[in-house]
Amino acid sequence: MRFAYKYRLYPNRAQVHFLENQLHEACDLYNAALQERRDAWKVCRKSINYYDQANQLKPMRAEGLIGLANFSCCQDVLRRLDKTFQAFFARVRRGERPGFPRFRSFRRYDSITFPSYGNGCRLLDDGKLRIQGVGLIKIKLHRPVRGRDQDRYDQAGRESLVRVFFRRARHRRVTGVEQGDRP
């Protein structure tokens, strides 16, 4: 079973600026990866997948072309694009109106995902959140976070700077009794 916990962040002005810069970088990476896939197909009739683009991340970061602080965030951006293309091709196979993947504006790209707990983002015991490159951010923990740490995913959204933790809990057997005359 998966639970989502949503908490509000209270960053200072410099931290807000850094998080918005990371959103810009993630959006630019998404659009550049989409452009690369489109151009490769138009010019060479070559299909590019996630692994082809993920192999380019390390050299691009070494040259300073990508400014995202966390490598896993870059990989997640490419995974998002790959899921978009998989959904597009699935709609084509089903004969539905496909809707080719579009470029995203900064306004529509509103979250950064840290795919694994501790890799770029960690919740500390004193009620603060440590984000790689940003530092400690105050967070209002209005209810306790339960579940296993290794299965937590963190997202930083632009709208009112909210942090969402997804946690897995052990599956409990649930028994229910329903009364009434509805089938």
Question: Where do the PLM segments sit?
Answer:
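Nucleic-acid substrate recognition interfaces
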Residues: 1-183
